[in-house]
Curated annotation (Swiss-Prot):
GO terms for biological process: translation. One of its GO terms (cellular component) is plastid. This is Small ribosomal subunit protein uS14c. InterPro entries: Ribosomal_uS14, Ribosomal_uS14_bac/plastid. It comes from Helicosporidium sp. subsp. Simulium jonesii. It comes from the Eukaryota. Keywords: Plastid, Ribonucleoprotein, Ribosomal protein, RNA-binding, rRNA-binding.
Length: 101
C-alpha cells in the first residue's frame, strides 16, 4: 500500500487539474489560433507559464483508489490488478467471473 502522503498529494493534484482545466484549455485554444501575432502568442505563453505546475494533466498519475498503487492500474475501474482480482474472485464485481473453457 502506498504512503498516505502520496495518495493525498495525488488527490490535491487532481483538484488543481480540475480547477484550472477550463482556463488552460482556453489559453491553449488561443495559442493554436493561427491569426495571432508573435506578441500575442508570447503573452498567452506567459499566462500559461504562470499557472501552477501541478495543474497540468500530464502530472497526474493513475493510482488505485483503494490501495494507492501506481502500477498495474486498470483505468476503467481505477483499481489495481491485485484488488481487481480479489474483488472478482469474491464475487463483488457484478458480471465478472473466472474464465473457464
Amino acid at each position: 500500500m502506498a504512503k498516505k502522503s502520496l495518495i493525498v498529494r495525488e488527490y490535491k493534484k487532481n483538484i488543481l487539474v480540475n480547477k484550472y482545466y477550463k482556463k488552460r484549455l482556453l489559453l491553449k485554444s488561443q495559442l493554436n489560433n493561427t491569426i495571432n501575432s508573435t506578441d500575442c502568442i508570447l503573452k498567452i505563453l506567459n499566462k500559461l507559464q504562470k499557472l501552477p505546475k501541478k495543474s497540468s494533466p500530464t502530472k497526474l498519475r493513475n493510482r488505485c483508489t483503494l490501495t494507492g498503487r501506481a502500477r498495474g492500474v486498470y483505468s476503467e475501474y481505477k483499481i489495481s490488478r491485485f484488488v481487481f482480482r480479489n474483488l472478482a474472485l469474491n464475487g463483488l464485481l457484478p458480471g465478472v467471473f473466472k474464465a473457464s473453457w
